[in-house]
Amino acid sequence: MGKALLFSRGTIEMPNNIRLSAIRNVIAIFLLLTLCATAIGAGEYKPVFENSADFPLMGDWEGKWIDPHAGHEKHNPELAAQLVCLTQKQYLVRILPKLNVRSVPYLEVKANVKDNMIVIDQAGWKCTFANGTCKGTGRLHGKDVGIELKKVERLSPTLGQKPPKGAAVLFDGTSFDAWQHNDGRKVTWSLLKSGTMQTVSLFWDNKQNQKKGLGGDIVTKEKFDSLKFHMEFRYAVEPGKRGQGRGNSGLFFHGIGEVQILNCYGTPGYWNECGAFYKHEPPKRNAAAPPLQWQTYDVEIQLPDKNDKKTKALVTVYLNGHRIHYKFPMSYTGNDGVSIGLQDHINALQYRNIWVVSHPSK
């Protein structure tokens, strides 16, 4: 049993050794809390938009089976992989028959990265991803078969497309003149020296921006009839984030609906993921590119006649050159055209080269 506390005149007195120990503990706790607060402030989460060399394994890989002995692969030995950054030290490795199609992976495993290298030795697969190549063996129809893959960068065919004559340029990298916040405020997003805009969040987790009145969705000042629209965007590397918590934004055609923007690289492409009419219709394929890579949305909208309240708008969407919706019918609730919006949804997104060609509805 420890020493008893001494009571005197209704107060508690402690022996000197206990008193000094208690004081030391209080000081230690105070210093710990101070250091934690400092660390939290200094280590505030920042998305990674640059330094792709820090993620040399992330992205698309293409190659083939070497002399497959049976099955479809004997006639078409095509092979592909997606390496998805989960954390600074762990990746999701998906080995597939082909990129941008919904297919059952040959292999889908989590693997650690060390010295810019991933070594797979799981489920009968033995291969190494390093320096832009992957060689080894995979399990195919009960046998070990050689594989070889190379890192590839597949860019959208419409990347950098210039606005045609007569187009309304919504963003050329110099100003936000064509935009405003939904509540009419001047745009408070960031205009970067690179000629891109970057979201500034007014979301629930950013109290400072809320106090300063910064951030929030933006929308075009002008409305448009039937249109052809082009935009380029990219999301950051956000290690540790998952699902709707990474690369989340949205492309809105007000009066019709939202085309989702989301870092869903390496996912099936559900109805709430990139390319979907959000929680309405999934894309025909997941054509989302890996983080850091510039991507394109090309959208065509045919609005019904202004006096026609029954016919729906027809929407065609291309993501990175892949047609993911074709003349999909969407209810149109407007009567004087559509404004175009970009969503603030916590995450940092970048946009550039935004333009639209509008023509009267038939």
Show the residue positions of the predicted features:
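A glycine-anchored, Pro-Gly-centered beta-turn/N-cap motif
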Residues: 57-60
